[in-house]
Amino acid sequence: MGLTSQLLPPLFFLLACAGNFAHGHNCHIALREIIETLNSLTEQKTLCTKLTITDILAASKNTTEKETFCRAATVLRQFYSHHEKDTRCLGASAQQFHRHKQLIRFLKRLDRNLWGLAGLNSCPVKEASQSTLEDFLERLKTIMREKYSKCSS
């Protein structure tokens, strides 16, 4: 049984509407998860949050939103890959060790979600100014909250 020509336009319309709804809904969910992760990260005070990271957010005037997300994910990946086993971050106590492992887990989650929003395979990151991880995450949280308010309106 084939589709009649009368049914095709309404079906395409329904598919287009469903796609737009799903895209907006996914944007909403992804941003909410990123903001929740950033909230958890900025509440944590670990030895690693005082270390420096390449601050791509300070020099993001001529970049697209997707490039900014891609570069943020890239510098976060560089940071947690380099500091995952850093003795300055691990601390001496079991509690400090646990906090560090939790920080790395949250950074990996944030990296994954930013890559999903960026939708790019790779992006170059030039050496820029440095800031603490804590300041970088606060600025990223502000950007994500602004995007969330635009996405949900």
UniProtKB/Swiss-Prot annotation:
Pfam families assigned to the protein according to its UniProt record, in alphabetical order: IL4 (PF00727)
Keyword terms: B-cell activation, Cytokine, Disulfide bond, Glycoprotein, Growth factor, Secreted, Signal
MF annotations from Gene Ontology: cytokine activity; growth factor activity; interleukin-4 receptor binding
Gene3D superfamilies xref list: 1.20.1250.10
Disulfide bond sites: 27-151, 48-89, 70-123
One GO CC term on file: extracellular space
Alphabetized SMART domains for the sequence: IL4_13
GO biological process: B cell activation; immune response; interleukin-4-mediated signaling pathway; negative regulation of inflammatory response; positive regulation of DNA-templated transcription; positive regulation of macroautophagy; regulation of immune response
Record flagged with keyword ATP-binding: no
Subcellular location: Secreted
Primary location class: secreted
Keyword match Acetylation: no
Signal peptide feature range: 1-24
Residues the record marks as carrying a glycan: 62
Family to which the UniProt record says this protein belongs: Belongs to the IL-4/IL-13 family.
Functional note: Participates in at least several B-cell activation processes as well as of other cell types. It is a costimulator of DNA-synthesis. It induces the expression of class II MHC molecules on resting B-cells. It enhances both secretion and cell surface expression of IgE and IgG1. It also regulates the expression of the low affinity Fc receptor for IgE (CD23) on both lymphocytes and monocytes. Positively regulates IL31RA expression in macrophages. Stimulates autophagy in dendritic cells by interfering with mTORC1 signaling and through the induction of RUFY4.
Protein name in UniProt: Interleukin-4
Organism, as annotated: Cercocebus atys (Sooty mangabey)
Name of the coding gene: IL4
